[in-house]
A protein has these predicted regions:
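C-terminal ends and interior cores of transmembrane alpha-helices
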Residues: 84-101
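A membrane-interface helix-boundary motif in multi-pass transporters
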Residues: 161-181
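Cytoplasmic membrane-interface "Motif A"-like loop-to-helix N-cap segments
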Residues: 72-86
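Short amphipathic helix-loop junctions that connect adjacent transmembrane helices
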Residues: 31-48
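Multi-pass alpha-helical transporter architecture, strongest
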Residues: 175-209
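Intracellular juxtamembrane helix-capping segments at the cytosolic ends
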Residues: 119-133
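Helix-to-loop junctions at the C-terminal end of transmembrane segments
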Residues: 61-75, 163
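Juxtamembrane intracellular "pre-TM" segments in multi-pass secondary transporters
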Residues: 1-17, 208-210
Length: 210
């Protein structure tokens, strides 16, 4: 199967597992950010809309910058930096719910979240390309997409379990998402994005750079 085949290629399976965790966290925070800022931070509906607009605006602008960074330092080092930024975003967001801090202290969060969001998608695909032989791209990108879809389902379900079923609250749910980012970071650290020689795998020996 495709999953078993992925184990033959160094770093690919680790990347896909890590991708599940960070995609789970990112997709979930996108879905529930509006509710969080109104119910936990104390923003009104209009300000919540402004938060989302700020995040999307910075995501668009930062996408061009992240592209240059990927070209310069490579997708792994870029994604590692993006995950560190997500750690700050999730920690800040959780603390905004746990602590009685003024609501204005939350405003840096949508800026950082937008920047991190564009960085995630800008570095994610080139990283996958570095780990996949050209002849196997079609096969493994199906697995790549499946990981993303599964994360998109499980993340909101986990959020609902924590917030609604267990009644632990949204700040706890955000803390769990922070843990998912930390796990993905730890999994990715050993995965090099240096060009591979696939000749001993029976595929092409050249790997396109991102």
């Amino acid at each position: 199967t495709t999953f078993r085949n992925s184990r033959k290629y160094p770093g690919l399976l680790r990347f896909l597992i890590a991708r599940f965790f960070y995609t789970d966290a990112v997709n979930t925070v996108i879905i529930f950010m509006g509710v969080y800022v109104t119910d936990e931070v104390g923003f009104g509906t209009q300000l919540a809309s402004v938060v989302m607009l700020i995040a999307m605006s910075f995501a668009v602008v930062a996408g061009f910058i992240w592209g240059r960074i990927v070209d310069r330092i490579g997708p792994k080092r870029t994604l590692i930096r993006v995950l560190r930024l997500w750690m700050i975003v999730f920690a800040w967001t959780a603390l905004s719910g746990f602590l009685p801090v003024p609501s204005w202290t939350f405003w840096p969060v949508p800026v950082m979240a937008g920047i991190a969001l564009s960085g995630t998608w800008t570095a994610d695909r080139p990283y996958m390309l570095r780990l996949t032989p050209s002849a196997k791209i079609g096969e493994f990108y199906g697995l790549y997409g499946m990981v993303g879809r599964f994360a998109a389902i499980l993340g909101p379900a986990l959020w609902g379990l924590i917030v609604n079923t267990l009644g632990l609250g949204r700040p706890v749910a955000v803390t769990i998402l922070l843990a998912a980012i930390l796990i993905s970071y730890a999994i990715l650290r050993p995965v090099s994005d240096s060009p591979r020689d696939w000749s001993n795998k029976g595929t092409d020996s050249t790997q396109p750079a991102s």
